[in-house]
Swiss-Prot record:
Naturally occurring in which organism (per UniProt): Synechocystis sp. (strain ATCC 27184 / PCC 6803 / Kazusa)
Leader sequence residues: 1-35
Alphabetical keyword list: Cell inner membrane, Cell membrane, Ion transport, Membrane, Signal, Transport
Gene3D superfamilies in UniProt: Periplasmic binding protein-like II
Taxonomic path: Bacteria, Bacillati, Cyanobacteriota, Cyanophyceae, Synechococcales
Protein name per Swiss-Prot or TrEMBL: Bicarbonate-binding protein CmpA
Domain of life: Bacteria
Topology relative to the membrane: Peripheral membrane protein
Role description: Part of the ABC transporter complex CmpABCD involved in bicarbonate transport. Binds bicarbonate with high affinity.
Localization of this protein: Cell inner membrane
Family assignment from sequence similarity: Belongs to the CmpA/NrtA family.
GO biological process: cellular response to sulfate starvation; monoatomic ion transport
Length: 452
């Protein structure tokens, strides 16, 4: 299994086994025992006027999703007929029980009863391509679009209120690092899947405040149900989580929000659409048709007047199966932070899907892939498979298919929104650190806490 050993593989599967389902359980709805395989039936809508040269090779594909706000473009493209508009009338959007299940299902593909692709934390497509998290089984994948920016945050248990454990934890670093001296255990934090987005966000937050997430605290992959219960009873201290969890955690007095990822890295890359390379290579026109449908869905979602309908659709029984009240505030960019912090009421700090304050959200910048793999190197993840930045760049060039995104956007008439470069340029984090994709080694050198 390379750097992802069998024990960690099994622990990860167990740790994420109830991740998506707990959202339903906490809302008062019993978890669906068939959640890993439930999904929508192929759309019955007829395709619009499509020229022969753009007619998809197939109308059928099975896309997996996790019931969190990152999945909205897939769901809306299906429900509002954007997939069907471009000839993809046989799309099945299939709920996955957790990230481990999605990983396993894409490995076997839809013909084996799995999925062809769908929604992914980064850099899962790269890791699956290299066989790093699939027991050495290399399944080439293509990253095709970014689904969303923002929509995540760091939750903290109420026992730490008033201790300075907020966005900037510099002054609370000694309190966190010395927690074992007064409490008989280290400060404990959790995420739902290792070495990907939510792990990276909480690691960056700790390290920016002078806390080493590998030595000063216990950082674990833990199911949300267990994590939230731990926050209630005082055995879990922090949690890297995504919408609608920030809303729930504060309103249900489970804890408070130390900060949003929108504050840690404004307009950061989040989750992506990625599909098996063999499917894309066989069906390039269908791939672009999917992309066009998702692009239209992203634009539709980002119109504030459509957000109430977005909430109605994604909260429905076929998808998230939660009360609409749980999703209304996050989709407005409204967050009650707790611990005496001012509330946030800013549409630009909530989940965005097509445009943000920098440019296009949907376009899969190679520079963002590079940050995810550079961060992997920073923390010493997958040393054998990704030993250096040159290897990382080669993997990105193999996996990232921004060229297909450009072609699809051009064919759909979205030329004004096509970025001029595969790099978004220099990125700036809340602690003043910058990441220049033209010089990622300088970023690594600038970091005080790292494993390289």
């Amino acid at each position: 299994m390379g750097s992802f050993n069998r024990r960690k593989f099994l622990l990860t599967s167990a740790a994420t086994a109830t991740g998506a389902l707990f959202l339903k359980g906490c809302a008062g709805n019993p978890p669906d025992p068939n959640a890993a395989s439930t999904g929508t039936n192929p759309s019955p809508q007829a395709a619009g006027d499509i020229s022969p040269e753009m007619m998809p090779e197939t109308a059928n594909i099975k896309l997996g999703y996790i019931p969190i706000v990152e999945a909205a473009p897939l769901i809306i493209a299906q429900e509002k007929g954007f997939f069907a508009k471009y000839g993809m009338t046989g799309v099945e959007v299939s709920k996955q029980a957790n990230w481990a299940s999605a990983r396993d299902n894409v490995t076997i593909g839809s013909q084996g009863g799995g999925i062809d692709g769908g929604q992914w934390q980064m850099p899962m497509p790269h890791l699956i391509t290299e066989g790093i998290i699939t027991n050495g089984n290399k399944v080439p994948m293509y990253v095709l679009a970014q689904l969303i920016t923002q929509g995540n945050g760091i939750a903290v248990a109420p026992m730490h209120e008033g201790k300075g454990v907020n966005l900037d934890i510099t002054k609370a670093a000694d309190y966190i690092k010395g927690f074992n001296k007064t409490n008989g255990r280290k400060f404990k934090a959790a995420h739902t899947f290792p070495n990907v987005n939510q792990d990276f966000w909480i690691r960056y937050w700790f390290a920016a405040g002078g806390v080493d997430p590998d030595t000063d605290i216990d950082l674990l992959a833990v199911p949300p149900a267990e994590t939230v219960q731990g926050m209630r009873n005082g055995t879990m201290d922090a949690f890297s989580t995504g919408d609608p969890w920030p809303y729930r955690i504060v309103t249900e007095n489970i804890g408070y929000m130390a900060g949003l990822t929108a504050q840690i890295w404004p307009y950061h890359p989040e989750e992506y659409l990625a599909i098996r390379a063999d499917w894309v290579d066989k069906n390039p026109k269908a791939t672009k048709a999917l992309l066009k449908g998702i692009m239209e869905a992203q634009q539709w979602i980002d119109d504030p007047k459509n957000r109430p309908e977005v909430v109605q659709i994604v909260s429905g029984r076929n998808y998230f199966n939660v009360p609409t009240t749980i999703l209304e505030s996050p989709f407005k960019g409204q967050y009650t932070m707790g611990d005496g912090q001012p509330a946030i009421d800013d549409f630009q700090k909530g989940p965005l899907y097509w445009k943000d304050g920098i440019g296009n959200v949907s376009y899969p910048y190679k520079s963002h892939d590079l940050w995810f793999l550079t961060e992997s190197i920073r923390w010493g993840f997958h040393k054998n498979a990704i030993p250096d930045l040159d290897t990382a760049q080669k993997i990105i060039d193999k996996v990232n298919r921004e060229d297909l995104w450009r072609e699809a956007a051009t064919e759909a008439g979205f030329t004004a929104d096509i970025p001029s470069s595969t790099s978004r340029g220099v990125e700036t984090f809340f602690d003043g650190i910058t990441f220049d994709p033209a010089n990622p080694s300088a970023y690594l050198q600038s970091l005080a806490i790292k494993k390289v």
